[in-house]
Amino acid sequence: MILTTTNEISGKINKEYKGIVFGEVINGIDWGRDFTAAFKNFTGGRVSEYEDELIRSRADAINEMIVRAQNVGANAIIGVKIDYEPMGQNGGMIMVVASGTGVVIEE
């Protein structure tokens, strides 16, 4: 499956549009990570615990979007966009949404 943030794939023809496809993931951040993040916020430095969770969440959202595109018969996704949104009390959860347009391109 080809994924691109552009509205076309160079050298390929969009034969059919299958519609908008999404992948959504909501993950909680545990108190241990919150404690570490608060400490690093005070002392400075990157918060790898949160970064790792974002990487996992983004990959899960993209994979879910791919499955949904395949379910509607698409073999590529164009116009891919990824959004992040804190959720829950004090931002204790993160929502990651991957979206794009499922298309059938010439092989």
Residue positions per predicted region:
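N-terminal presequence-like segments and the immediate start of the first folded domain
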Residues: M1-R33, N71-N75, P86, G92-E107
